């Protein structure tokens, strides 16, 4: 196989339509947009769901179900290896320390995940811990302190 054998061949590729370039081209004058009206104008067209003033389908149908978005809690996740690297030599890690180091967004709930090894006893404070992360911290003689997470609404 060589470069000149690759498909598609240049003559097989369809050329782009250049509209509004004279009546001989077949797409001159109105450039395929028809005569006048909103869709013929630059930037013209209707919004998705607009049905010409008729009550649109999404408003004719009833509301359905329950929207839980305002109560959703999204955690900033931090792995143990990153936590230990940032706080090397410290035996107590509070939430304020985590925010101050920039490991999580200020005020965001924090979850600690288990990647990495804990070698010394640590006291860690966060909103949530994965089961294995908590086991690793407790296994090294440390302490886990879970705080209550508040929805970010």
Swiss-Prot record:
GO cellular component: cytosolic large ribosomal subunit
InterPro entries linked: Ribosomal_uL15, Ribosomal_uL15/eL18, Ribosomal_uL15/eL18_sf, Ribosomal_uL15_bac-type, Ribosomal_uL15_CS
Region named Disordered: 1-49
Biological process, per Gene Ontology: translation
One Pfam family from the record: Ribosomal_L27A
GO molecular function: rRNA binding; structural constituent of ribosome
Keyword set, alphabetical order: Ribonucleoprotein, Ribosomal protein, RNA-binding, rRNA-binding
Signal sequence coordinates: none
Composition bias type Gly residues, residue spans: 21-31
HAMAP family: Ribosomal_uL15
Subunit structure: Part of the 50S ribosomal subunit.
Protein purpose: Binds to the 23S rRNA.
Family stated for the protein in its record: Belongs to the universal ribosomal protein uL15 family.
Record's protein name: Large ribosomal subunit protein uL15
Source species of the chain: Desulfovibrio desulfuricans (strain ATCC 27774 / DSM 6949 / MB)
């Amino acid at each position: 196989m060589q470069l000149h054998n690759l498909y598609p061949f240049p003559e097989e590729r369809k050329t782009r339509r250049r509209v509004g370039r004279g009546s001989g081209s077949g797409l001159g004058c109105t450039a395929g947009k028809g005569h006048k009206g909103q869709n013929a104008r630059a930037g013209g067209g209707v919004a998705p769901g607009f049905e010409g003033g008729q009550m649109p389908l999404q408003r004719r149908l009833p509301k359905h179900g329950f929207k839980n978005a305002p109560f959703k809690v999204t955690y900033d996740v931090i792995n143990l290896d990153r936590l230990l690297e940032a706080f090397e030599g410290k035996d107590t890690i509070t939430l304020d320390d985590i925010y101050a180091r920039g490991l999580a967004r200020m005020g965001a709930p924090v979850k600690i995940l288990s990647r990495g090894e804990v070698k010394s006893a640590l006291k860690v404070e966060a909103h949530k811990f994965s089961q294995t992360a908590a086991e690793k911290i407790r296994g090294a003689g440390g302490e886990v302190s879970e705080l209550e997470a508040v929805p970010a609404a």
